[in-house]
Amino acid sequence: MVLIRVLANLLILQLSYAQKSSELVIGGDECNINEHRFLVALYDYWSQSFLCGGTLINEEWVLTAKHCDRTHILIYVGVHDRSVQFDKEQRRFPKEKYFFDCSNNFTKWDKDIMLIRLNKPVSYSEHIAPLSLPSSPPIVGSVCRAMGWGQTTSPQETLPDVPHCANINLLDYEVCRTAHPQFRLPATSRTLCAGVLEGGIDTCNRDSGGPLICNGQFQGIVFWGPDPCAQPDKPGLYTKVFDHLDWIQSIIAGEKTVNCPP
């Protein structure tokens, strides 16, 4: 189940790389219906087309990837099978959208993150619950869980109705720098490198914005990966949630001055 990154040739920050805006999990399996209560689905309002995943972090806020942004977005909570008619109580709109503009020690590769305030709070239920922000940084070598409604085949596009889940490995960032020399990734970064070096398992197009969960903690946001997905020795990049905590928490707290991480 390859979480196929949004390889729709979206050029973010003037970088010519394939983003996982709508990636699926390749080499994975259908997620248990109770495994993804925090996973939300983002749709384009006008075309009604599925865009990305996102993560509910409390009853009023969703965290996703910046490149998933559109002028008009619909957000659905408590979704498993996208072919089933959504209930209007599952639908939300962005009340506010926040983008990461901090410049200190952050490169353009580190800013693919968007915080969305919903137009009204959601009610938790059997199929809706938040995923807490991380309390500690991720550990290289961890086995992480990725999930989404992204492509399950690549380069052919096969989009599933239900989310797929897969386990991938958290790798040293230098592995991604070596694997993708053409992009001249910075020597240090606030992004995570993750994948299965043997290939066959990956996130893919339309998985973008969804969570990477390591040791039970929300550590990454699906961001970028090679096209086709799931190639051997070609891991992907994930926005590192832990390094954006100050920014996230200051916005949610309603502080007038947003805190930029050191």
Curated annotation (Swiss-Prot):
N-glycosylated: contains mannose, galactose, N-acetylglucosamine, and fucose. The active site is at H67, D112, S208. It comes from the Eukaryota. It catalyses: Selective cleavage of Arg-|-Xaa bond in fibrinogen, to form fibrin, and release fibrinopeptide A. The specificity of further degradation of fibrinogen varies with species origin of the enzyme. It holds the Pfam family Trypsin. Residues 19-24 form a propeptide. GO terms for cellular component: extracellular region; secretory granule. This is Thrombin-like enzyme crotalase.
